[in-house]
Amino acid sequence: MSNTVSLQFPDGSVREYDASMTGAALAESISKSLAKKAVAYAVDGTVRDLSDPLGASGKVEIITREDPRALELIRHDTAHVLAEAVQELFPGTQVTIGPVIENGFYYDFARNEPFTLDDLPVIEKKMREIIQRNKPFTKEVWSREKAKQVFSDKGESYKVELVDAIPAGQDLKIYYQGDWFDLCRGPHMASTGQIGNSFKLMKVAGAYWRGDANNPMLTRIYGTAFANDNDLQAYLHMLEEAEKRDHRRLGREMDLFHFQEEGPGVVFWHAKGWKMFQNLVSYMRRRLDSHGYQEVNTPQVLDKSLWETSGHWGWYRDNMFKVTVAGDDTDDDRVFALKPMNCPGHVQIFKHGLKSYRDLPIKLAEFGNVHRYEPSGALHGLMRVRGFTQDDAHIFCTEEQMAAECLQINDLILSVYKDFGFEEITIKLSTRPEKRVGSDELWDRAESVMMTVLEQIRQQSNNIKTGILPGEGAFYGPKFEYTLKDAIGREWQCGTTQVDFNLPERFGAFYIGADSEKKQPVMIHRAICGSMERFLGILIENFAGHMPLWFAPVQVVVATITSDADEYAKEAAAKLKAAGLQVVTDLRNEKINYKVREHSLQKVPVILVCGKREAEEKTVNMRRLGSRDQESMTLDEAIARLCEEATPPDLLRLKNAG
């Protein structure tokens, strides 16, 4: 066996090295300055400790703090330092798990007295002390017996349970930072000093061990960490901005919706919120109609036999709401379920009546109410609910039509997002997972088509980012995922396009081909908004409640300065309504500044102020939300201007094209 390995560097050069050489020694052999900046290295994309030997040939990269991959290491190491700090400050506290998550990390602790926000500054101070010590991260591999014995002797019962859960034959890695150690898969940076000081503990929360309500309640401390202070401060500023834009707060202030205990995870829509919801549905309905979709509606309650056939009963039963009818006055003892998805119902509509290849593609769309169980702790306003409306569509087509249909879907999705002001879009292709249905040949064909489509999208749209998510596809086929970036830089995964060869086969769906033989259609699942409720939540936060005029539930308030203008205000409001605008009249005996402030808090886009002079001259004083400017104009001019601005973008395009 050779003791040398062949390494290819990012510049394409290839060199031979001793297989026992460590990543740290490799970095130093390139340059001393690189060795000082190195925090880890990677071979064929797998990140390793600098202390690990090279071991095998491959493509090698030295990772520094500036590398995006270093951020996960920084956060991972900070979580370990958090755990050490807690155990130094609060002896007897048990540590459990501390993973890296999106935008940060957390660590769960078992302690008789839960931590509070007041504890965080003290813990942070201790963490900075530990980082200052600059202790090296060192790795040992222990036997299962040793690990269980050591953790048991320390009173770390949760760690013992974690050791028991590690599959036989898998290494049990222990990472030290000075004298403190933890069970961990790694990798880590070279020392605690490489973490830096750009971190912050954010909040505390309760969390059940392993997410099971039957297990003990732990205290979870959340934190975040970045490579530098600028990135940390930018993130904290974004969080402040996000708090101001929180759709739950704005929903209360704007009187859009509410939730209550008797209906956890389902929305009580108020008049203005429901108007906004209907605006979204009306817009989407027009877009679908112009793209050849047929709108349908399928039952919300269906016998479990249908869900067994579809596979949802086996794959998704724990997340479904079951319905049984019991009592002396009924002989119906069947089990039903509220639909969690619309797709099986659409297959039933496709199957109703004989279909020819000449009929394809058939595009069925539904604004379908679906219900999915979510743990109460996961519910979050409109963003995470149990009952919601899915803007589902399913295209039944031939395999030859699949690429063209995916491209048409993409054009529609991007156009919708652009109409709502989202310009930065990322599209990622999720490929076959380990557990899947269908032959490899079928997956090869489907993935090949979607890769071709993705490349065409990339060539046509310069501002669209694309990528691949290996192994992240649905069990029945590959899919595209569409992610939006909002006004404050957050990303939201919304639209999907999924190819499905499985469901038509399960239900025996077919069409008659050109050769007069039965053939199975390809089924393309497509969602643009996804959950309409969630999409509205995203819009509210993106616009900070200041919705575009065409989408606002109340577009104009006509407010009087004195009662002398009441009749004129009523006349003006009537004309505005006749022109198709959503108008409210405010004739209250209040000061005009009070009225303007109140309606501004309600995020009404336009306020038309009418006083005695305006009544005499048939004018209005226009004030825009967020602006101190005032503009005087005739009522007719105001109506013309507002009607143009209040025209939805799809209708405006038709008007301009005509």
Curated annotation (Swiss-Prot):
GO terms for molecular function: ATP binding; metal ion binding; threonine-tRNA ligase activity; tRNA binding. Residues 1-64 form the TGS domain. SUPFAM superfamilies: Class II aaRS ABD-related (SSF52954), Class II aaRS and biotin synthetases (SSF55681), TGS-like (SSF81271), ThrRS/AlaRS common domain (SSF55186). One of its GO terms (biological process) is threonyl-tRNA aminoacylation. Its EC number is 6.1.1.3. Keywords: Aminoacyl-tRNA synthetase, ATP-binding, Cytoplasm, Ligase, Metal-binding, Nucleotide-binding, Protein biosynthesis, RNA-binding, tRNA-binding, Zinc. Zn(2+) binds at C343, H394, H525. The gene is thrS. InterPro entries: aa-tRNA-synt_IIb (IPR002314), aa-tRNA-synth_II (IPR006195), aa-tRNA-synth_II/BPL/LPL (IPR045864), Anticodon-bd (IPR004154), Anticodon-bd_dom_sf (IPR036621), Beta-grasp_dom_sf (IPR012675), TGS (IPR004095), TGS-like (IPR012676). Its cofactor is Zn(2+). The keyword Electron transport does not apply. Pfam families: HGTP_anticodon, TGS, tRNA-synt_2b, tRNA_SAD. This is Threonine--tRNA ligase. Homodimer. GO terms for cellular component: cytosol. It comes from the Bacteria. It is found in: Cytoplasm. Residues 246-548 are annotated as: Catalytic. Catalyzes the attachment of threonine to tRNA(Thr) in a two-step reaction: L-threonine is first activated by ATP to form Thr-AMP and then transferred to the acceptor end of tRNA(Thr). Also edits incorrectly charged L-seryl-tRNA(Thr). It catalyses: tRNA(Thr) + L-threonine + ATP = L-threonyl-tRNA(Thr) + AMP + diphosphate + H(+). CDD domains: TGS_ThrRS (cd01667), ThrRS_anticodon (cd00860), ThrRS_core (cd00771). Binds 1 zinc ion per subunit. Belongs to the class-II aminoacyl-tRNA synthetase family.
